[in-house]
Amino acid sequence: MTGTPLLSFEPLTEGILLKRYKRFLADIELEDGSCVTAHCANTGPMTGVLIPGQRVRLRHAPSPTRKLAWTWEQAEVPGADGQLCWVGINTALPNRLIRATIEAGCLREQLGEIESIRAEVVYGKNRKSRIDLLLQPSREAIDQRPIYVEVKNTTWSTGSTALFPDTVTTRGQKHLQELMDVLPEARAVLIPCLSRPDVTAFAPGDSADPRYGELFRNALDAGVEVLPCCFRFDRDGVTWQGTRPAQGQQPSAAL
């Protein structure tokens, strides 16, 4: 089902990134020469995808309830194959994208038939956490355990390997532990949302967060399933590119 369109939207506006600042803001020069300030949902370091002077794509959505009418959605970067490629950098999109992927049946082989999907469901030992997606298998499924899905937007890469995280993430560490905690009564699935089409594998970003890498390997040993999903980002939509294999450790060349 590679090539399946999953999301479509009004064509994005292209421009040139001037700078990002205060974590949430980016100044961008549009094609007509005007400059706008856009909201940047990705507050991390954006390793490898934050390049002043690069082409970017913005969504224009003016609203009385929004301070900024523009949102930074995509960035053009050098790809693993030497060609330029577009990367989805809006961290608000992956949960919606993975849900659309499941609903389209692209992960039927890995997850089975799914009867229902719930988002942001409270769970955890102290009931203070929320799982991104909670799936209920169909009545015909042999394995009736609920499926807890944690989604991670992944934009950093070295060579053709996608890496997460690109900085220390105590929140991400906590999510791995919580996935392990639901086993074996439920299935636990970590889905790295590979928001660039040029990668052929996924690995934990050990060089950015060694503790996360350690917990990632513990999670694999405990039975947490890792299902990297790859996508192509275009000006007017997002297309399914298939799953990618998960590696237990960041390639040595990148450490």
Curated annotation (Swiss-Prot):
The protein's matches in HAMAP family, at most eight in alphabetical order, are given as: SfsA (MF_00095)
Concerning its family, UniProt says:
Belongs to the SfsA family.
Annotated NCBIfam families: sfsA
Q: Which InterPro entries match?
A: SfsA, SfsA_C, SfsA_N
For molecular function, the Gene Ontology terms on record are:
DNA binding
Q: Which cysteines are joined by disulfide bonds?
A: none
Record organism:
Synechococcus sp. (strain WH7803)
Taxonomic placement: Bacteria, Bacillati, Cyanobacteriota, Cyanophyceae, Synechococcales
Alphabetical list of Pfam families matching this protein: SfsA, SfsA_N
Please give the superkingdom of this protein's source: Bacteria
Per its record, how is this protein called by name? Sugar fermentation stimulation protein homolog
